[in-house]
Amino acid sequence: MHFIYETKTLYSELFIGKRWLEIGSGNCFPKAKSHSKDCEWIGVDIEKGNGVDVVSLGHLYKNNQPFDAVCAFEVFEHDPYFDLTVTNMIEHLKPGGLFMMTCAYLGRKEHGTSRSHPVAMPFTQEMDRWKDFYRNRTPGDFRSIPMFKELINGYWVINEMSKDLYYRGWKR
């Protein structure tokens, strides 16, 4: 993903020897992890899989040590607890740490539900609350989360071609 590569180019120090948390780490998209070196990387997802270290819902994951960076790629449109997941990610972030995400934006076709293409999100099909949940996200969805105000110097990108929303910001 160009956004991840751009972030690494601008903030290369975060991709060497740092501690990362990735929510939704088992999905099939390219990861920031592949751009990192000697980082401690904890991948969290709702089912066992490649890149998954901890099986947990994103909003329920707990760890006593803060992270230098937290990320989620193409996850929030599938998460009915999206606001709680974002809050939890920010709570796990060190002051000055990076919050980075991508998700589906307005106009993106529904995917990963029993109505659309269940094979695209196999984990969610076994979870009643999740299997038919889908919502494209906007910057306003994130800004409405009280904890999101803890992030500063935010940078939003809307990719009109893929209908994706990208964001990176720093915890106060």
Where are each of the predicted segments found?
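Sparse, context-dependent recognition of short Cys/His-centered cofactor- or disulfide-binding micro-motifs
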Residues: 5-8, 26, 41, 127, ...
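Residue-level marker of regulatory loop/turn positions in helix-turn-helix DNA-binding domains and
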Residues: 12, 64, 158
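N-terminal start-of-chain detector that recognizes signal peptides
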Residues: 11-16, 26-29, 129, 136-143
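S-adenosyl-L-methionine-dependent methyltransferase catalytic module, highlighting the catalytic core
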Residues: 80-90, 94-172
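Conserved SAM-binding loop
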Residues: 15-109, 167
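Class I SAM-dependent methyltransferase Rossmann-like catalytic core
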Residues: 1-15
